[in-house]
């Protein structure tokens, strides 16, 4: 899980999701998981 100020899709399978006022990126590739913090 990477914590970044700006989250971006890295590949086509990345999805941007909002949970509890936070922005996450979920992907099949665990290295692409990101959180906005």
From Swiss-Prot:
BP-aspect Gene Ontology terms: translation
PROSITE patterns with a match to the protein in the record: RIBOSOMAL_L36
Keyword check for Ribonucleoprotein: yes
Molecular function terms, GO-annotated: structural constituent of ribosome
GO cellular component, one term: ribosome
Swiss-Prot/TrEMBL keywords: Ribonucleoprotein, Ribosomal protein
Lineage top rank: taxon: Bacteria
InterPro entries cross-referenced by the UniProt entry: Ribosomal_bL36, Ribosomal_bL36_sp
Protein family: Belongs to the bacterial ribosomal protein bL36 family.
Matching PANTHER family: 50S RIBOSOMAL PROTEIN L36, CHLOROPLASTIC, LARGE RIBOSOMAL SUBUNIT PROTEIN BL36C
Name by which UniProt lists this protein: Large ribosomal subunit protein bL36
Source organism: Dictyoglomus turgidum (strain DSM 6724 / Z-1310)
Gene that encodes it: rpmJ
